[in-house]
Amino acid sequence: MSHSDHTAPLEARLSAALSGTARVPGDKSISHRALILGALAVGETRISGLLEGEDVLNTARAMRALGAQVERTGDCAWSVHGVGVAGFAPPAAPLDFGNSGTGCRLAMGAVAGSPIIATFDGDASLRSRPMRRIVDPLEQMGARVTQSADGGRLPLTLQGARDPLPITYRTPVPSAQIKSAVLLAGLSAPGVTTVIEAEASRDHTELMLQHFGATVVTEPEGPHGRKISLTGQPELRGAPVVVPADPSSAAFPMVAALIVPGSDVVLTEVMTNPLRTGLITTLREMGGLIEESETRGDAGEPMARFRIRGSQLRGVEVPPERAPSMIDEYLVLAVAAAFAEGTTIMRGLHELRVKESDRLEATAAMLRVNGVTVEISGDDLIVEGKGHVPGGGLVATHMDHRIAMSALVMGLAADKPVRVDDTAFIATSFPDFVPMMQRLGAEFG
């Protein structure tokens, strides 16, 4: 499997004001999609700013195993020569996606539209995650699961459709991964493939499909939903992609700068896609001093420079419809809530229960062991902010990179140091996290 057997415990201590300018790594969602769409396009796709964490590198290896030419040409610079829609070759060995649900599920969609057989696998964490919700619509399109572990989990062997059928599919939960898998499979189908979602999820796949030359039409559906229609069998053309900085990774230095008094930190080229900025909206509602400037865009994705300063935060209520735009950020938002004055209620977090760990329970445990009063009520997380955090706890990360980073951020402003049992998994999304935070003034040891 992708990860080493060595644990890497670390302690975060009360730090002086953080300061400096940083660019967090490229967005993980865009990085996976650039590699996969580059592999399905004809001609060369040049990618700059690619996130070179383990998850994305596993997707790069998988695309290579499926017949695309994928090469690293420089620092975070990659070239992909694609095989065209439905042009994948059968891989010689199982495709190992390590810890990455996104890479695995999107690749399943892409493979479902090619007449090949491929086996998908991953680490212990990914093997425990649900895959039926992805496979069900792909089977409606003509793909077949010929073998899988209990409950449709990995390792899973998928036989792609020789003649894929376009479908209209209502997603059972707001999930960009389900939507993307159906759209990627729909590339090979004649006619129009439509996905209807009751709550709008991340639209990176739709934007990038258009960047590569596909026809995608998005219409509103109900109060919060969307209807996305893809015209099948396009000729995708290789296109340059500049990967903006990942807002889910920017969340950690952003919250650290807000809770460490006197901090003044600038983060550059952060993606500001409105379906990913729920955390920034929420932190501003809490009183966070966050200034935005230098906005621009690439491959359909907007980005901006942010200046974040130490702030007095207050508790707020976060509505459930905001969850899809910040599902990965609730862990570090809970840390901000612990340092705020007053109660913060985060509603509708059921999707956190099927992430890399049960993130709802793990977040509550991380706060409790450090002296914070927290309650889970159904799918709601309630944090009683006291303006400071006692700290002094050892946090179990459950092989989850975001729990590890959230706990380390908490330790930078807690009264006593916060210890994390293992930071090895941080490499899945943010290999440079510890040194980058240390350059801004964070005290780790």
Swiss-Prot record:
Annotated localization: Cytoplasm
MF-aspect GO terms: 3-phosphoshikimate 1-carboxyvinyltransferase activity
Q: What is its EC number?
A: 2.5.1.19
Q: Which residues bind 3-phosphoshikimate?
A: 28-29, 33, 175, 177, 328, 355
- One Gene Ontology term from the biological process aspect of the record: amino acid biosynthetic process
UniProtKB keywords = Amino-acid biosynthesis, Aromatic amino acid biosynthesis, Cytoplasm, Transferase
Q: Which reaction does it catalyse?
A: 3-phosphoshikimate + phosphoenolpyruvate = 5-O-(1-carboxyvinyl)-3-phosphoshikimate + phosphate
Which residues are responsible for catalysis?
328
Transferase is among the record's keywords: yes
- Give GO cellular component annotations, separated by semicolons: cytoplasm
The family database entries (Pfam families) matched by this protein are listed as: EPSP_synthase (PF00275)
**Binding locations of phosphoenolpyruvate:** 28, 101, 129, 177, 359, 402
Q: In which pathway does it act?
A: Metabolic intermediate biosynthesis; chorismate biosynthesis; chorismate from D-erythrose 4-phosphate and phosphoenolpyruvate: step 6/7
Q: Which family does it belong to?
A: Belongs to the EPSP synthase family.
Its quaternary organisation is: Monomer.
**HAMAP family of this UniProt entry?**
EPSP_synth
The entry's function note states: Catalyzes the transfer of the enolpyruvyl moiety of phosphoenolpyruvate (PEP) to the 5-hydroxyl of shikimate-3-phosphate (S3P) to produce enolpyruvyl shikimate-3-phosphate and inorganic phosphate.
Protein name (Swiss-Prot/TrEMBL): 3-phosphoshikimate 1-carboxyvinyltransferase
